[in-house]
Amino acid sequence: MRRIILASASPRRKELLKQLIGDNFVVYPSSYEEPPQPGLDPEELLLKHSVEKARDVAKHFDSGLVISADTSVLCEGEVLGKPGSPENAEKMLEKLSGKKFRVITGLTVLDLDSGKETSEFESTNVWLAELSKEQILAYVRTGEPLDKAGAFAAQGKGAVLVEKVEGDFFNAVGLPLFRLGKILERLGVSVFDEGFS
């Protein structure tokens, strides 16, 4: 069985990967700093970040598969990352309230044994309910939105704010499992192998 390395500190990505392959992976967060890249469209930027994260972690291992991802929310042409503060979370939720937007992820799998690097992009449409100021403030007070792209967690308390999801739901959580499964399959790794349980 191949060693799998998740290049992320995200508890959501860890839980999602665990759904696919059990505990058969190691977590090694990337130390890559995401510099501003003016002129790149959001998809290119997320792919670039996921590639750089995978390459950063790959330097610490001599074999296995490194999986990395970078996720943002795109609403009306604006990229919304993690808010980082309650004030920014409020602003983001006000912007997303009652709207359709896209959750976009750049995904990279780097095969250290063959040197093959696969990077792909996933997009999921999400419709957020019309939120009152009180709902926004109450949700922000939970602390949940502060470290989430777009200031909401589709898998947490934020689930009650989501009216509809079109596409890979798991992408809206932070790791597009369908696309990841297809990439792993092309690299000769099946999540249905007995070793992954």
Swiss-Prot record:
Residues under site feature: Important for substrate specificity: R12, T71, Q155
Example GO biological process: nucleotide metabolic process
Single annotated GO MF: nucleoside triphosphate diphosphatase activity
Record-annotated active site: D70 (proton acceptor)
Subcellular location: Cytoplasm
Protein name: dTTP/UTP pyrophosphatase
GO cellular component: cytoplasm
InterPro entries: ITPase-like_fam, Maf-like
Reported function: Nucleoside triphosphate pyrophosphatase that hydrolyzes dTTP and UTP. May have a dual role in cell division arrest and in preventing the incorporation of modified nucleotides into cellular nucleic acids.
Enzyme Commission no: 3.6.1.9
